[in-house]
Amino acid sequence: MARPMITGALALAGMLSITHGAWIPIKASLAQVLLDNAWRETLYSGQSLKPWPWADTWPVARLSVPAQDKSMVVLSGANGAALAFGPAHVRTSAPPGSADNSVIVGHRDTHFAFLQKIKPGARLQLESADGAVHHYQVSDARVLHETDTDVLAATGSR
């Protein structure tokens, strides 16, 4: 009697473990669909729309790297919750697409992993919430510690 119960308990634990492991990628994929929808609605309506009702962030831009066929929604507020779903704009920096330092951050091992292949001269596009598309060229690529705030300083240029 004890052996079937142990076997059943182990089988249940295994299924729960697999389900939990699969939940994270499923949640991440669904989040990207919801972020894309919120971005399209933001462009259409001109209003900042949350991707889901309980979100504490919203799309503020779309960052694209055409040469790598990468495109991702940039979220407002560089906090842990936003960064779990994609790159995020540091609210204390200039708005995305403005003529000053606009800082967008992301985890280098997830959403910004493609930046390992970025070289000076690469072209980036940033679509701001007003629908304007801004073109940039990479001049330097480096990993900064979160306490390195020199990049937040206003420069008056893009």
What are these regions (language model features)?
Residues 4-158:
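Solvent-exposed, non-transmembrane regions of membrane-associated and secreted proteins
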